[in-house]
């Protein structure tokens, strides 16, 4: 998890340098964004917000308004969120928390199906994988990238090409 937080921090700083934001806030948000995983995976984003609001050390460096902005940013960072992050800080951490690696995404989608839908046969898993990839990653999918400078822009385009090429997608699915 520490390595993940470092990667999110690096990617956050890369995105943030293009915008008028407070770099120290960006760094703190990246460091705190997943701390709520220690409490509960499903609501970790909300737990992370609570942790920020309750951390007395942050009050030494940030105003109450900045702390609230940081808490909201971590609450808004989930890729599956159904609403746009409330601030540029939320968009930065949401974007930086994504590491779009096309084949890994496909493999994780298949694995999730195997773990959570054991009753499906191979064709059922194929259809579930297709549905999920189209719903989330294809053109018009709910995954939103917020910054043109993000390395994810290129990676998402590569994933979309694979999704459009069902023969190639099927080969990856079959691995």
What residue ranges belong to the model's regions?
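Hydrophobic, well-structured mid-protein blocks that either form specific transmembrane helices
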Residues: 49-83
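Sparse recognition of residues in long alpha-helices and their boundaries
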Residues: 24, 64-65, 90
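His-Asp-centered metal-binding catalytic motifs of divalent-metal-dependent phosphohydrolases/nucleases
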Residues: 23-40, 44-48, 69-79, 97
């Amino acid at each position: 998890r520490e390595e993940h937080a470092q990667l999110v921090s690096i990617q956050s700083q890369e995105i943030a340098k293009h915008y008028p934001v407070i770099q120290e806030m960006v760094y703190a948000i990246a460091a705190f964004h997943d701390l709520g995983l220690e409490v509960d995976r499903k609501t970790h984003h909300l737990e992370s917000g609570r942790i920020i609001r309750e951390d007395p050390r942050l009050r030494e460096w940030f105003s109450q308004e900045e702390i609230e902005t940081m808490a909201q940013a971590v609450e808004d960072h989930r890729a599956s969120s159904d609403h746009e992050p409330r601030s540029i800080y939320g968009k930065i951490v949401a974007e930086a928390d994504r590491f779009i690696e096309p084949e890994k995404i496909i493999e994780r989608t298949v694995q999730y199906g195997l773990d959570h839908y054991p009753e499906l046969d191979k064709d059922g898993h194929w259809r579930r994988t297709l549905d999920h990839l189209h719903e989330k990653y294809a053109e018009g999918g709910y995954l939103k990238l917020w910054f043109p400078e993000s390395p994810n822009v290129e990676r998402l385009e590569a994933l979309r090409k694979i999704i459009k090429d069902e023969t190639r997608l099927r080969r990856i699915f079959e691995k």
